[in-house]
Amino acid sequence: MKTVKVNIVTPDGPVYDADIEMVSVRAESGDLGILPGHIPTVAPLKIGAVRLKKDGQTEMVAVSGGFVEVRPDHVTILAQAAETAEGIDKERAEAARQRAQERLNSQSDDTDIRRAELALQRALNRLDVAGK
């Protein structure tokens, strides 16, 4: 089966590099399914899971925003942060979820609601990818 080269890169360095049959990402405009030979595209990403399918198996990588650049034979994901399922510390992710939820529930005047919502989304995404 045909494959496409996928690189996931953060400011801290590469996170993932493999030949994949299909990539699914959550873009600002909606979900994108990318197969080999896809038309060139650049799209901003939402917080979400990147699904990478190969040989009947699906791997997941949690990404926190960024961009996807698609070429017919190569997909590059430039993410603000990214972690493979194996690399996620579940206890740390759960603690981050609890902190974000507490900030949202506090309703104090100095709470930055948008930042707390984004922190909660990131924590929930990490927990989802890690499989709780």
From Swiss-Prot:
Keywords: ATP synthesis, Cell membrane, CF(1), Hydrogen ion transport, Ion transport, Membrane, Transport
Keyword Transport: yes
Compartments (UniProt record): Cell membrane
GO MF annotation terms: ATP binding; proton-transporting ATP synthase activity, rotational mechanism
Signal peptide positions (record): none
Region described as Disordered: spans on this chain: 88-112
Membrane topology recorded in Swiss-Prot or TrEMBL: Peripheral membrane protein
An annotated GO cellular component: plasma membrane
GO biological process terms on file: proton motive force-driven ATP synthesis
Bias kind Basic and acidic residues: ranges: 88-102
Pfam families named among the record's database cross-references: ATP-synt_DE, ATP-synt_DE_N
Assembly and oligomerization: F-type ATPases have 2 components, CF(1) - the catalytic core - and CF(0) - the membrane proton channel. CF(1) has five subunits: alpha(3), beta(3), gamma(1), delta(1), epsilon(1). CF(0) has three main subunits: a, b and c. The F(1)F(0) complex interacts with SpoIIIJ and YqjG; YqgA is found in the same complex.
Family according to the record: Belongs to the ATPase epsilon chain family.
Stated role: Produces ATP from ADP in the presence of a proton gradient across the membrane.
Protein name: ATP synthase epsilon chain
Gene this protein is translated from: atpC
